[in-house]
């Protein structure tokens, strides 16, 4: 998210090749990834990915403008995906209040996009922003569905 602010938007077509949006959900085009294969080289990206985006940055290599441009494009794709998922949920539930936790909840650009584009009216980011916040949300959902009392302290 931080690097994205310094990037330029010209890699959208490449992002559209590797991250597909279908029926308001997303999936990775696995032709571009190799992390799911049981292989010994432990490479995350396939040769096809490297041909499309170039060699991964080495640990001792400085960031180039291209890295900032990649961050910008990934950020925009992330916003597009989450916005579509949230829009679908709002349409189904008619609830325009959203709670986000985990790394997604800390993405200020995403949150601003959801409010600015009127996808939701309000976003709550719990103080426990790590992924364990999802466990708390699941517990609250269960209690609500079972009409059990939620005790607030």
For each feature predicted by the language model, list its residue ranges.
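Short acidic/glycine-rich loops and adjacent helix/strand connectors
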Residues: 1-153
């Amino acid at each position: 998210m931080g690097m994205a602010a310094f990037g330029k938007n010209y890699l959208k077509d490449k992002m559209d090749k590797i991250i597909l949006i279908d029926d308001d959900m997303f999936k990775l085009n696995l032709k571009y990834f190799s992390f799911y294969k049981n292989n010994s080289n432990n490479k995350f990206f396939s040769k096809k990915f490297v041909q499309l985006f170039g060699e991964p940055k080495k640990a001792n290599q400085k960031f180039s403008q291209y890295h900032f441009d990649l961050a910008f494009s990934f950020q925009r794709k992330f916003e597009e995906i989450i916005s579509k998922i949230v829009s679908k949920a709002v349409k189904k539930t008619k609830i325009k209040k959203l709670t986000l936790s985990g790394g997604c909840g800390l993405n200020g650009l995403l949150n601003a996009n959801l409010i600015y584009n009127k996808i939701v009216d309000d976003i709550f980011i719990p103080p426990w922003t790590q992924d364990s916040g999802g466990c708390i949300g699941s517990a609250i959902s269960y209690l609500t569905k079972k009409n059990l009392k939620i005790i607030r302290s």
